[in-house]
Amino acid sequence: MQKQEKIIEMFNQIAPTYDKANRILSFGVDVSWRKKACKRVLELCEENTLNIVDVACGTGDMIEIWQESVQKAHKNIKHIRGIDPSSQMLKEARKKFKNVEFIEAGAQDLPLESESVDILSISYGIRNVVERQRALGEFARVLKKGGILLVLEFAKRERGGFIAFFRDFYLKNILPSLGGFISKNKEAYAYLPNSIEEFLSKEEFSTELQSVGFKNVDFKSFSFGVSSMFIARKNDR
């Protein structure tokens, strides 16, 4: 089994307990990160009627927050879609959202028309994409000229100190055990800290975004650098 297929199967296995585990393991603070990110994107977006796509949507956390955030921003959603390669994650998402289109597909091969999307988001999923540059190229392809990409991701540690020590201890010792207890799949939650450390630095990821056609990469960290937000705009030429 290829690495990407193994990752997808892992998410299939933990899908039934995914929402519960997320809220407990992040102490619920991931919802705050998502809301702040959506609010910032909508402040930057000039369009009032939006076509939004959430890639690696999982059980639909970002779908719900996009719906709430767009309403608060006094804008409208023309079409919102969730895309994920995990059939079991989408099964859970469809239970929660009856009027949202969910598509089973990978980030590296989006079944969407070119230049058809105003906002594309991917939250805590890009590090799980094996063909990352191909996926970023797909994001650029489907976004309209001037469209906005939002990437939320756990940050690779770049400095020391007490916060970094506590973060590493939690990720390597507490999270795998607690996540494994909730999901009955410790291996899946042991994968998380390893995937974070193998991901790019913010400078490296910003360079990758620019290399496939994005500009004005805006970066912000949350909760002492635990989570990172990247907002980039597709070149309009």
Language model regions located:
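Conserved alpha-helix/loop element of class I SAM-dependent methyltransferases that forms part
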Residues: 28-49, 65, 69
